[in-house]
């Protein structure tokens, strides 16, 4: 079997322990001077770099949110402007429609009045022409009656004959 001093290697002495602790302390000091400080410097630089990247990312996110808000505002303004333009176009179209209807009504009234005036004028002309024809016919009949002494039947035939001639002249 193994004996305890062979397992441990040798007997434990304070001198060896003190030397081991002293060597370990020197090793720690050397590691701290040559390895720990540069390692901590690199870690600090890395921390600062990551911090600046996080700050830049947050700033970019804030700018993106601001840009998004601006774009939403511009889009909303464009919607409002387009809605206003549509409403204005509708109102303008309605005004133009009303103006066209008014103009058409005025024109139809004018044409109607002109037609009435033309009809009245034509009626007056027809009445005037008829009066002239009746007057000349009356004079003609009277002259024939004076020329002849006609009885009632001949007078009636004479009048009928002149009326038929008048109808044929038209």
UniProtKB/Swiss-Prot annotation:
Keyword S-adenosyl-L-methionine in annotation: no
SUPFAM superfamilies xrefs: F1F0 ATP synthase subunit B, membrane domain (SSF81573)
Record bears the keyword Membrane: yes
Top-level taxonomic group: Bacteria
Membrane topology: Single-pass membrane protein
Any one annotated GO CC term: plasma membrane
Keywords tagged on the record: ATP synthesis, Cell membrane, CF(0), Hydrogen ion transport, Ion transport, Membrane, Transmembrane, Transmembrane helix, Transport
Subcellular locations according to the entry: Cell membrane
InterPro entries recorded: ATP_synth_B-like_membr_sf (IPR028987), ATP_synth_b/b'su_bac/chlpt (IPR002146), ATP_synth_F0_bsu_bac (IPR005864), ATP_synthase_B_chain (IPR050059)
GO molecular function ontology, one term from the record: proton-transporting ATP synthase activity, rotational mechanism
One Pfam family of this chain: ATP-synt_B
Membrane spanning residue stretches: 11-31
Entries under PANTHER family matching the protein: ATP SYNTHASE SUBUNIT B, ATP SYNTHASE SUBUNIT B', CHLOROPLASTIC
Family named by the database record: Belongs to the ATPase B chain family.
Record-linked NCBIfam families: ATP_synt_b (TIGR01144)
Record note on quaternary structure: F-type ATPases have 2 components, F(1) - the catalytic core - and F(0) - the membrane proton channel. F(1) has five subunits: alpha(3), beta(3), gamma(1), delta(1), epsilon(1). F(0) has three main subunits: a(1), b(2) and c(10-14). The alpha and beta chains form an alternating ring which encloses part of the gamma chain. F(1) is attached to F(0) by a central stalk formed by the gamma and epsilon chains, while a peripheral stalk is formed by the delta and b chains.
Function: F(1)F(0) ATP synthase produces ATP from ADP in the presence of a proton or sodium gradient. F-type ATPases consist of two structural domains, F(1) containing the extramembraneous catalytic core and F(0) containing the membrane proton channel, linked together by a central stalk and a peripheral stalk. During catalysis, ATP synthesis in the catalytic domain of F(1) is coupled via a rotary mechanism of the central stalk subunits to proton translocation. Component of the F(0) channel, it forms part of the peripheral stalk, linking F(1) to F(0).
UniProt protein name: ATP synthase subunit b
Taxonomic source organism: Listeria innocua serovar 6a (strain ATCC BAA-680 / CLIP 11262)
GN (gene name): atpF
């Amino acid at each position: 079997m193994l004996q305890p001093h062979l397992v441990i290697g040798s007997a434990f002495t304070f001198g060896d322990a003190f030397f081991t602790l002293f060597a370990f302390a020197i090793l720690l000091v050397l590691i701290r001077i040559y390895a720990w400080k540069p390692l901590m410097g690199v870690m600090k630089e890395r921390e600062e770099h990551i911090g600046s990247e996080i700050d830049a990312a947050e700033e970019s996110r804030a700018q993106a949110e601001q840009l998004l808000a601006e774009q939403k505002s511009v889009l909303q303004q464009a919607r409002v402007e387009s809605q206003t333009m549509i409403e204005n176009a509708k109102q303008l179209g309605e005004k133009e429609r009303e103006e066209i209807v008014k103009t058409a009504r005025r024109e139809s009234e004018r044409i109607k009045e002109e037609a009435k005036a033309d009809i009245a004028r034509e009626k007056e002309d027809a009445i005037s022409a008829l009066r002239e024809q009746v007057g000349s016919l009356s004079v003609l009949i009277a002259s024939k009656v004076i020329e002849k002494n006609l009885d009632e039947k001949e007078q009636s035939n004479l009048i009928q004959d002149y009326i038929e001639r008048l109808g044929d002249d038209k």
